[in-house]
Amino acid sequence: MTDFEKKDGFIWMDGEFVDWSQAKVHVLTHTLHYGLGVFEGVRAYLTDQGTKIFRLEDHTNRLFESADAVNMEIPFSREKFNEVQKEIFKVNNLKEGYIRPMCFYGAQGMGLRADNLK
């Protein structure tokens, strides 16, 4: 099992690549308490043409459709999400792997209302 405290590399969070150890979420994050968030599971494989993400467009579209279903506005375009998913393998020197793009509400407020959160 991986010891995540000792892991190195980068995570894309809030629109920028941050060091693994700096990617932290507050304990009062709305999604942690109420479960309102969306995610995908995306796999990349090493091919003769380099690293390729399996059905990237389908995964990204599904993420955005899931967000739309719960009235969650994603502050990035689908194109940006696709770029970042490709880039995360490069910045971490990975040829293959699994990533979990997720969108969640932060700790700007608590309570059942989520229409005022980001």
Q: Where in the sequence are the language-model features?
A:
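Conserved alpha/beta cores of soluble small-molecule-handling proteins
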Residues: M1-K118
